[in-house]
Amino acid sequence: MEGAGGANDKKKISSERRKEKSRDAARSRRSKESEVFYELAHQLPLPHNVSSHLDKASVMRLTISYLRVRKLLDAGDLDIEDEMKAQMNCFYLKALDGFVMVLTDDGDMIYISDNVNKYMGLTQFELTGHSVFDFTHPCDHEEMREMLTHRNGLVKKGKEQNTQRSFFLRMKCTLTSRGRTMNIKSATWKVLHCTGHIHVYDTNSNQSQCGYKKPPMTCLVLICEPIPHPSNIEIPLDSKTFLSRHSLDMKFSYCDERITELMGYEPEELLGRSIYEYYHALDSDHLTKTHHDMFTKGQVTTGQYRMLAKKGGYVWIETQATVIYNTKNSQPQCIVCVNYVVSGIIQHDLIFSLQQTECVLKPVESSDMKMTQLFTKVESEDTSSLFDKLKKEPDALTLLAPAAGDTIISLDFGSNDTETDDQQLEEVPLYNDVMLPSSNEKLQNINLAMSPLPASETPKPLRSSADPALNQEVALKLEPNPESLGLSFTMPQIQDQPASPSDGSTRQSSPEPNSPSEYCFDVDGDMVNEFKLELVEKLFAEDTEAKNPFSTQDTDLDLEMLAPYIPMDDDFQLRSFDQLSPLENSSTSPQSASTNTVFQPTQMQEPPIATVTTTATSDELKTVTKDGMKDIKILIAFPSPPHVPKEPPCATTSPYSDTGSRTASPSRAGKGVIEQTEKSHPRSPNVLSVALSQRTTAPEEELNPKILALQNAQRKRKIEHDGSLFQAVGIGTLLQQPDDRATTTSLSWKRVKGCKSSEQNGMEQKTIILIPSDLVCRLLGQSMDESGLPQLTSYDCEVNAPIQGSRNLLQGEELLRALDQVN
């Protein structure tokens, strides 16, 4: 038993010794292996700090890659580098916009340049020897295998096998936008544009030791260029580069202005146009595939292609396109392109598309040249052609707009004959031009040119059907077949008198129009439904609150507002014309002073009183028989008294601006004109409205009961003071205090109510509105007699209404007698 136990102990001791020897042998082998790997690592063309920290697997991987590279270099016909080439080797990688990568036919990266760390964040030794499929996007693996395949089949005669490769590859990148390095597990995908070719190398010893022929070695040599994101472009863009943005269907939504200098296109004309319209036809297939890759991988570089210039020819361009994704839903939003123009315009005389023919058929000229040629040939062109050209070129009209400090020269609307404007105005009385169609063709042309209404609205006879202010007018209103009249107004003449010394300054600085005919515009009967007489009340009333002045609602006739009630028990002291003081002198504009047959300054030196008297004789009345009776109504507007200090004219208080604008009118300005005028003359009314209406009837015509009922209704009113009497009348008043210059006279507004009766539905209405102006006040305040026109008091204007066929107005007891006879 003891012998058996001793034998077992010996066996245990021997086994332990063997194990210890085995461990020592293994330790010795590992140490020798480590020494070999250490020596092998230092033989690799790597920095010492890199090679000293490599593990055995890395050393083997790098060594195998190095041996393969050496095999490729030995297989190729390499020239002996001289000293100059050796010095230039260090600059090659700096000149590249990417890194160099060499792949075997199975996808191993046997070589990669050391500048890969600059673009991808991964170091050279981390990638060398690894398979490219470990670092690329899974969706690109199939395309990558196709690029690595070299087909050795038969090639058609006369054609060489294509060994060029160009594709886009998504590879892992550990660089952040700030240039920092992240973990490989958090790496993002960066698009690389890989261009290169396949090389097939035959070794020097074509046969192995066993007598078998070795297959040629195939590798893919690539230059990988990362496509920068537009938001991370570090290098400033030069003058040969322009940016563009496109929708997902490749239509321009933005383009840089530099494209104008490079290709001739204006950025505005490219918006909404597809970029395919400007590609050269031979490059369309290549660009279509490139755009397909862009939507698949997010970024592409088109390479050099031809893009058509505007006036013919093409330029070579290289574009970097990037798809911009929405940060919320990660959906593609737009495409941003950085376009590098690498050449000038080539074959600029050659036309490639229809867009380029537009410049040949329609040469583009500058706006300045067009306007110069247009106005230098204006004598030989008619007005219609000039209007058409100006209408087609609205942008060119801005060249004609006056700038600050320019001298404004009033245009002469008269003819080119030897007759002056004074002689033209002498031919026809001025009121005929203002209120009635002129018989003079020259004056008609002037009126048409000054009219703010469209040219299609030709002047028609003035008619009115809504002013039964006088008893005789009311009688004619109720008649079934009234007659219409055409009135002609004249002014008495006096001798020429020189104006006061202060008139010169007024003439020089006055920006007013040339004649009173420019202060009016007429409204045709076609506008009756929109431009009713109640609009005049709302337009010139101080307390109006109407929001819509052009109201088309019909209102009943307010009979109490047509004429004042004059009680018989009160004895009003009515004054005749000879008891009134003559008109006072006023300064006139040079245009009004030239019209000798119509207006002349008087001898008075006081400021003018805004009065007007019109006499219609039987010789001047023209009766025209028609189906219905048409009224003739004239609404004349006057400004405040001239002795009130005037403020500088503005666009809202004057119907004409300093530059001669004709856009302002009572019907357009509305309430704003009255408000501005009230601010400039707060102590006096701004507009005095006078309605003159006259008819001819048979003297023996009797009033029917309707007239009596109308007058009875009128007499129910009471007169509290003069102001209320003025506002109640149907005819506005003209009053002024000639002896008191310090106080301003309150002027009343004409209040008119109008409607259409059933018998007058077909009648046509025409209203003449004379816009308020100081010039009109001065013009109308002057007459042609040595003794000026008499000043009318409030009672004269209200009571002494002109009756049929009479040149003189009833006065005093005769008027009271006439009123008693009516009752």
From Swiss-Prot:
Q: Where is this region: ODD?
A: 401-600
Carrying N6-acetyllysine, the residues are K532, K706
- Region: CTAD; residue ranges are 783-823
- Taking every annotated instance into account, which residue ranges of this chain make up the domain PAC? 302-345
Please give the biological process terms from Gene Ontology that the record holds. Answer: axonal transport of mitochondrion; cellular response to hypoxia; intracellular glucose homeostasis; positive regulation of cytokine production involved in inflammatory response; positive regulation of DNA-templated transcription; positive regulation of transcription by RNA polymerase II; positive regulation of vascular endothelial growth factor production; regulation of gene expression
Function summary: Functions as a master transcriptional regulator of the adaptive response to hypoxia. Under hypoxic conditions, activates the transcription of over 40 genes, including erythropoietin, glucose transporters, glycolytic enzymes, vascular endothelial growth factor, HILPDA, and other genes whose protein products increase oxygen delivery or facilitate metabolic adaptation to hypoxia. Plays an essential role in embryonic vascularization, tumor angiogenesis and pathophysiology of ischemic disease.
Subunit composition and interactions: Interacts with the ARNT; forms a heterodimer that binds core DNA sequence 5'-TACGTG-3' within the hypoxia response element (HRE) of target gene promoters. Interacts with COPS5; the interaction increases the transcriptional activity of HIF1A through increased stability. Interacts with EP300 (via TAZ-type 1 domains); the interaction is stimulated in response to hypoxia and inhibited by CITED2. Interacts with CREBBP (via TAZ-type 1 domains). Interacts with NCOA1, NCOA2, APEX1 and HSP90.
How does the record comment on the protein's domains? Contains two independent C-terminal transactivation domains, NTAD and CTAD, which function synergistically. Their transcriptional activity is repressed by an intervening inhibitory domain (ID).
Q: What is this protein called?
A: Hypoxia-inducible factor 1-alpha
| Originating organism | Bos mutus grunniens (Wild yak)
